[in-house]
Amino acid sequence: LFESYCASILATSALGVAAFTGTGLLPEGFTAGDMQLRAMFLPVVLAGVGILLSVAGVFMVRTEEDASQKSLLKALARGVDLACIGVAIVSLGLVYWMLPNFLGVCVSIITGLAAGWLIGKWTEYCTSDEFAPTRKLADQSLTGPGTIVTAGIADGMRSVWAPVVVVVVAMILAFGFAAKWNLNDVTWFAMGLYGVGIAAVGM
């Protein structure tokens, strides 16, 4: 996880530099070097803020001594939700400060954030004993190890469709928002790729 997160930060920084190599996207009063530095440091700053807010979210988790699995999941969800809301708010301020003419990048960040949140909820549904898939799988053990192994493999294969759909939709939306939906303009293509990268950092 750490390696993939660092890779997404570095890749997004590189895409940010590439997006402002020409003069087509430069706002008035900014040089290419200014915008490249801002686009390069945005994912780094966003990741740092996200880590701090995640730590703060951990301290928001409160449970009772003999809490059930359901109440534990709710407490964890509360911490995650608060951290996500915090990142969304801070990202708006960061993008407004660092890339003021490209607020679509903020929407790309929120898109990635929402995609990560949805995938987390789906994972919880597929793996928690509070929900139907795991309970049905437990019932398979009554007939022996063969059926539970087969059912487990089938459930695992079946569970990946939602994350795939969410990631594909998030990529399309992140690209479009960052590129301001100028899909036929080559100048904005690199900015769209930057949006996909920054969405991965937000995720």
Question: Can you say where each PLM-predicted feature lies in the sequence?
Answer:
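Hydrophobic packing and interface segments
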Residues: 1-203
